[in-house]
Amino acid sequence: MTSSDTPSLRLASASPRRRELLASIGVAVEVAPADIDETPLEDEAPAAYVERLARRKAQVGAEGTTLPTLGSDTAVVVGRRILGKPRDREDAIAMLSALSGTTHEVVTGIAVTGPQGMLSTHVVTRVTLRELQPDEIEAYWRSGEPVDKAGAYAIQGLAAIFVERIEGSHSAVVGLPLFETAKLLTRQGVSLWGERPAVP
């Protein structure tokens, strides 16, 4: 293992997408998924919900390490209804049917523990999906992609063909808003871009 491969951050998530996004900005991580209760509180606003879960994941994930620890959570929101991961086929089809032809919000919370204590923020991105036909929704479910995705779709996967427009952070919809994440990591002393040779 080279020094640039040595983890500088603990990621309190099993999401391969979040790990890949962090790798894209040169941050090597060790993965320690945090298993927490993700039930929304009564009348909890979506932004407060995802930020609370991100903070709790970072707190749980930080146990037993001196590394800064990142927690994150994403929710798809229609009105004030929070859509998490679908429970089953029927739930996924109901979610995709509700999102069909709408502009909805994808709200992502991030939190990082470290020398500066617990730092957190959230990002709201507006996504417009075209009208989806019932046979498309069924075929998409059969692809297996919706199973572990908030709102039952993955913007970086097969569902990319459903997306008419994005207003905000594309990486946040994938799983981690890189601009805001980089700011929090820098404040906690985490180096970005790994150890890259200087440009002559």
Swiss-Prot record:
What are its cofactors? a divalent metal cation
Location(s), subcellular: Cytoplasm
**Catalytic activity from the UniProt record:** dTTP + H2O = dTMP + diphosphate + H(+); UTP + H2O = UMP + diphosphate + H(+)
Site positions for Important for substrate specificity: R17, T74, Q156
Q: Which Gene Ontology CC terms are recorded?
A: cytoplasm
GO terms in the biological process aspect are: nucleotide metabolic process
Active site location: D73
Q: What is its EC number?
A: 3.6.1.9
Q: Which UniProt keywords apply?
A: Cytoplasm, Hydrolase, Nucleotide metabolism
* Single GO molecular function: dTTP diphosphatase activity
**Which Pfam family, any one of them, does this sequence belong to?**
Maf
Q: Which NCBIfam families does this UniProt record tie to the protein?
A: maf
Protein task: Nucleoside triphosphate pyrophosphatase that hydrolyzes dTTP and UTP. May have a dual role in cell division arrest and in preventing the incorporation of modified nucleotides into cellular nucleic acids.
PANTHER family reported in the protein's UniProt record: BIFUNCTIONAL DTTP/UTP PYROPHOSPHATASE/METHYLTRANSFERASE PROTEIN-RELATED, BIFUNCTIONAL DTTP_UTP PYROPHOSPHATASE_METHYLTRANSFERASE PROTEIN-RELATED
Family the entry assigns: Belongs to the Maf family. YhdE subfamily.
Q: What is this protein called?
A: dTTP/UTP pyrophosphatase
